[in-house]
């Protein structure tokens, strides 16, 4: 039932290739969060990715870190773009998590060009991140983002600063966008060469809700059937060296973990094309 592990970039940590995306805990009670922990432990997941903006998620994780203090590689994210704002945001995250340091702190959703320049210039959030690393509050520094341009933006970010990790969307439908795919491949090569951990999201995204009732806590409509989720997860995991952040819905988490635990070989393009046609998948970003 275990999920394979791989070196998380240059950090020296062997992370499960499926990372728990803790956005799923943003609006659930502690009882549900604790049931989710039991699921993670059953599959051996050892890496948690949360954010200061994920509702109560940091608070929900706090008891886990007290109960299992050495089990998880802990990552959180901050949305502030100035150094002063980022310092305050990090202090708040540490307090909410109940820890004196974390493994990875990420500049969250860094896509807007003006925000990008502010965050990565003197007096920006990156200044606070480096300072926090020097003080032992964080061990590693990463950057995340969404959108059709984010792979290209991450390439620029790695030219500006030597980030230890990146995070961005990756699924079969998104990679049919030639612009995104070309920039993703360039980013992938850079990450492999420089031992930058590459985290991917939206593996089981189906399409935008577009007026349909929201039956899941994800902001997009996800795949639901286990066999469809199997194909999507296996396709993502078939790329060597990448990690998959799970899903922002606790009800779907067991399906993603189950799929990952049974991964042996990738589906071919014909199987993935059939999935797209059968499920009527649509891109989230254009």
PLM regions and their residue ranges:
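N-terminal binding-site loop/beta-alpha segment at the start of enzyme catalytic domains
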Residues: 1-72, 128
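Conserved, mostly hydrophobic/aromatic
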Residues: 8, 20, 48, 61, ...
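Active-site beta-loop-alpha junctions enriched in small/polar residues
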Residues: 23-25, 51-53, 77-81, 107-110, ...
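Glycine/proline-rich, positively charged
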Residues: 28-31, 42, 81-182, 186-196, ...
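Glycine-rich phosphate-binding "P-loop"
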Residues: 19-31, 109-118, 210-225
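Structured C-terminal cap/extension of enzyme domains
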Residues: 41, 46, 162, 182-286
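Alpha-helix-loop-beta-strand connector modules within alpha/beta enzyme cores
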Residues: 58-77, 125-136, 190-193, 200
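Hydrophobic packing residues within well-ordered alpha-helices of enzyme cores
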Residues: 61-64, 153-157, 256-257
């Amino acid at each position: 039932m275990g999920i394979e592990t791989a070196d998380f970039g240059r950090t020296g940590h062997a992370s499960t290739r499926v990372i728990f995306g803790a956005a799923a805990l943003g609006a659930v009670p502690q009882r549900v969060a604790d049931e989710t922990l039991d699921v993670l432990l059953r599959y051996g997941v050892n890496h948690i990715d949360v954010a200061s903006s994920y509702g109560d998620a940091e608070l929900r994780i706090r008891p886990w870190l007290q109960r299992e203090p050495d089990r998880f590689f802990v990552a959180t994210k901050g949305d502030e773009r100035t150094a002063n704002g980022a310092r305050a945001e990090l202090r708040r995250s540490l307090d909410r998590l109940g820890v004196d340091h974390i493994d990875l702190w990420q500049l969250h959703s860094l896509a807007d060009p003006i925000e990008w320049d502010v965050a990565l210039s003197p007096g920006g959030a990156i200044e606070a991140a480096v300072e926090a690393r020097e003080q032992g509050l964080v061990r590693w520094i990463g950057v995340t983002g969404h959108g059709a341009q984010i792979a290209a933006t991450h390439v620029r970010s790695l030219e500006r600063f030597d980030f230890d990790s990146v995070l961005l969307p990756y699924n079969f439908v998104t990679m049919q966008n030639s612009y995104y795919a070309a920039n993703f491949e360039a980013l992938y090569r850079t990450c492999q060469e420089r031992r930058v951990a590459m985290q991917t999201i939206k593996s089981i995204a189906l399409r935008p809700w577009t007026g349909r009732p929201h039956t899941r806590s994800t902001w997009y409509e996800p795949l639901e059937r286990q066999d469809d989720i199997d194909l999507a997860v296996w396709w993502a995991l078939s790329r060597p060296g990448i990690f998959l952040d799970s899903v922002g819905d606790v009800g779907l988490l067991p399906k993603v973990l189950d799929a990952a635990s049974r991964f042996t070989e990738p589906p071919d393009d014909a199987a993935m094309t059939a999935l797209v046609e059968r499920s009527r998948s649509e891109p989230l970003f254009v």
